[in-house]
Amino acid sequence: YIKDERRIADSTRAALQALKQQGIITAIATGRSPSVLPEVIKQLMADTGMEMLVSINGQFVRYRGEPLATFPLGSEEVAETGRQMTALDIAYACVSDSKIYVSHETDALKAAMGNLGIAYTLGLPAAGESVYQMLAFYPPERDAEVETVLPASLKPIRWHDYGVDFLAAEGSKARGIQAALNQLGLTMQEAMAFGDGLNDREMMQAVGFAVVMENGHPELKALADHICPPVTEDGIYQGLKTLGVIEA
């Protein structure tokens, strides 16, 4: 997904179709919830016959339209985190599989959410509605202040100058992928992943073969088995071709 242009490279579509024809299961692992996937991603999944979505950083996995593995946060840790963010006057959000609920709007929230074109709902989720991840909106200079009050059961992962994910300490895309593969009778050693951001770190450490984009985060590139061009230069297609997974 080329975020700045909000489009999918034609070569990526062709690569995924080639994998499908070989009987290889393809999936998207994303920090987004299913409800805020860009339309071009939904269309890509439909066009290429992609049946698995590892969403919300691995906390909600759907296969063939049905939940395959889910890891909701505890209601008390959600409530406590909300109380702490309110005390610090920091806007926060609760992510369900269908909506993103925000406590209130701030310039920081608008900057982070607007950058990705993510829709949200003002207000908090109804009692009993599962929350899979939380978000908070503050600059890096407040990191230490927030981390001192964040429940130990959660970990912060920054994805924007003003946006941070609060994820279960043991949660990651890797956990979601592992749970999905277990259900399908496959192992992590049989999996290959492409990534570029810090929320891909555990995934890259866990899969059998890790491919990182050339423009990816330096910490992630250090974990790569192979580095391919960025998506703007047909990176996924070129990487699969170079590795001999698909033919030219």
Where are these regions (language model features)?
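Asp-based phosphoryl-transfer active-site loop
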Residues: 1-5
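Active-site phosphate-binding/coordination module
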Residues: 10-108
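Residue-level signal for inorganic ion chemistry
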Residues: 19, 30, 134, 177, ...
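Short active-site oxyanion
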Residues: 23-27, 50, 132-134, 189-191, ...
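Phosphate- and divalent-cation-binding pockets in alpha/beta enzyme and binding domains
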Residues: 36-39, 145, 176, 202-203, ...
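Short, structured coil segments at secondary-structure junctions
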Residues: 44, 48-49, 57, 149-153, ...
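Conserved acidic, metal-coordinating active-site core of Asp-based
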Residues: 78, 84, 88-194, 198-203, ...
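Asp-based, Mg2+/Mn2+-dependent phosphohydrolase catalytic module
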Residues: 125-126, 206, 210-248
